[in-house]
Amino acid sequence: MTANKTAKIQFYEGTDEPVVPEIRLTRSKDGTTGQALFLFEKPQALSSITDGEITGMRMIDSEGEILTKEVKVKFVDGEPIYLEAVYIWKNSSDFDRFMRFANSYAKSNGLGYSEKK
């Protein structure tokens, strides 16, 4: 079930999440700390074909794995619709590592990057 992508996201080990999230970044003024908010609409991880408990989100690329355990499910009319994950970085090297993953993930999924002015 795992596709051969350079960068991927998994909620269950060995199973890539095919739904591409909206990703929003915020950083402190000095740029050393911040967070990335991932918002997945109707992800496969919440579908009836998946079994098990989501305990985190793995961001996997050629350098290895970044893990966040901050994952929440948002319900609409009693149905799980959104999966929200937050990755927090606490120093510039963590941010640089995250950005390398983000660039690789964007290339793997044909995405672009835009900055709010």
From Swiss-Prot:
<keyword id="KW-0793">Thylakoid</keyword>
<dbReference type="GO" id="GO:0015979">
    <property type="term" value="P:photosynthesis"/>
</dbReference>
<dbReference type="GO" id="GO:0009654">
    <property type="term" value="C:photosystem II oxygen evolving complex"/>
</dbReference>
<dbReference type="InterPro" id="IPR038676">
    <property type="entry name" value="Psb28_c1_sf"/>
</dbReference>
<comment type="subunit">
    <text>Part of the photosystem II complex.</text>
</comment>
<dbReference type="InterPro" id="IPR005610">
    <property type="entry name" value="PSII_Psb28_class-1"/>
</dbReference>
<comment type="similarity">
    <text>Belongs to the Psb28 family.</text>
</comment>
<keyword id="KW-0604">Photosystem II</keyword>
<keyword id="KW-0602">Photosynthesis</keyword>
<dbReference type="Pfam" id="PF03912">
    <property type="entry name" value="Psb28"/>
</dbReference>
<protein>
    <recommendedName>
        <fullName>Photosystem II reaction center Psb28 protein</fullName>
    </recommendedName>
</protein>
<dbReference type="GO" id="GO:0031676">
    <property type="term" value="C:plasma membrane-derived thylakoid membrane"/>
</dbReference>
<keyword id="KW-0472">Membrane</keyword>
